[in-house]
Every structure is written in structure tokens, then in C-alpha cells.
Amino acid sequence: YWDLYDRASLPLADNTFPPEGSPDFAVHGDQELRSYDDCHDLPWPGEAPWDEARQRELVHGYHASVSYIDAQVGRLLDALDRLGVRENTIVVLWGDHGWKLGEHNGWCKQTNYEIDTRVPMIFSGYGVNAKDRKSRALTEFVDIYPTLCEMAGLPVPEELQGSSLVPLLSQPDKTWKKAAFSQFLLGRFGPPETREQERMGYAIRTDRYRYVEWYAWNKETKTKGEWLASELFDHEEDPDENRNLAHDSSYAQTREVLSQQLTMGWRYALPEQ
């Protein structure tokens, strides 16, 4: 799988800098990658990016890994065909997180940014009526379990926070959730100047905006403390989230509305039945 790619022709990130106006701690310090023996010199997000050769090596490895997984999924689907059970089997494929390949001068995962929280999610097989179609509706991982329950004819537990996606599997353009939510605990790692406390980031993503609120976090009591910072990104103007608009006066009302919606939480965002 490594040999499938010409490293020199692979695209590199063109926004190898932290979002303008965002707090230094919001871009993760790539602790996972930094633990490898040959990556101890990985720059912190606010420093100059790695040289192009190192970037291309990592991007090459990522593409090779994706191709490997693609081949394994193919083996699974071939087995379902061979056993004659493909048509009455529900197949769901999703990524558990996004991945930075130099974007925001970061690598790996673990932020509240779009690059780390947006993933592919594919339903195939039994019960999927809108074959070979895509939906731009806002969906979340918590939606997968209730969807599988309904597709399998099982009762959907009332206490779940997710919504069955069965209506979208027939009508991909159907009006759906008002927002999706994510949450990330930033521990005591990253650049030395950002390690004085742990922080919890709460994020809401609407059709147009991503809004994040950061709070001090008490890991012992599992409670949030003082507000530390906010981030606001307009995806119509800035799909790569390169400029934090939280302190832009022209977005003050938008920020206030999004903050209220974030506080109201997932119940506010549920699709109308």
C-alpha cells in the first residue's frame, strides 16, 4: 500500500498556521506523534512548520493506511457476497475522528476544529433506499445506535441522545438537526506555556458556524470553572477555520445566539418529528 503513492505528488496543507485570534492552547500539541523516537523535534503549533520532506513522509503514510483499510473493507463486503447475505445485512462505516495532516500546523487529532471532528459515515445494504446518494444533514455518532435499532426492528431506548437516521436514508435532503455537538478535554500537555491547567472545550456546529467555549476544568470534581476563551468560525467565508471571529463586533449577535444554543444543548437541536 505504501507503493501505491508517489510521495512527491501528494498535496500538502496550505494553512500550516494556528487560527488567527484563537487561544494558543486550542490547537493540540500532537502528544501522540511527539512520543515517537523520530518525532521529538516536532514543532509546536505556534512554531515554524516541519520541513517539507517530513510532512510528505507523514502524508504518504496516511494515504497508505487509508488504502489498507479500504482493501480490508472490500474483503468484508466480498465475504458477505460470497455467503449470500449482503442484501439483508446492514453495513455502517464511519471514522471515529478526523485527522490533521499539517493543517493549523498540527498533526493527528484531538481538537474541536472541523478537521478533527468531521468524518465520513456510510450506511449500506438492507433498509437503505437512497442508494449512492449523499446527505449534507448534520449528524452525530450518537445517531448510529438508534438508527440500527429502528432498521433491525428493535425498540429504540428513550434515554438516548441520538436520533434515528432512517428518514435520511430515504430522503437525504430532508430538513434535520439544527446543530451537532462535540466536547474535548485538553489535558496538561502541549507547549510548556499552556500546561498550567486543564481545559474543557464545548463546541456547537450549525449549517454555517462552528462555535467553541473553553472553560477551566477540575478533573477531580468533573466540573467546569471560569470561562477562558471562545472561538467562532464562519464556514461560508472561512471553511478551513483560519480566523477566529469571536471578538469581531460584527458577529456579536451571532456569537450570543450560538452561546445560548450551546447551553441549551442537544435537545434544542433535535429534528422535528
Predicted regions mapped to residue ranges:
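Short, flexible helix/strand-to-coil boundary loops that buttress conserved ligand/catalytic motifs
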Residues: 105, 169, 246
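Active-site-proximal cap/lid insertion segments
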Residues: 1-88, 92-138, 151-159, 220-227, ...
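Short loop segments at secondary-structure junctions
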Residues: 125-128, 153-155, 171-173, 207-209, ...
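Polar, surface-exposed loop/tail segments
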Residues: 86-92, 131-204, 251-261, 273
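Residues that flank catalytic or metal-binding motifs in active/ligand-binding sites
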Residues: 1, 97, 109, 115-119, ...
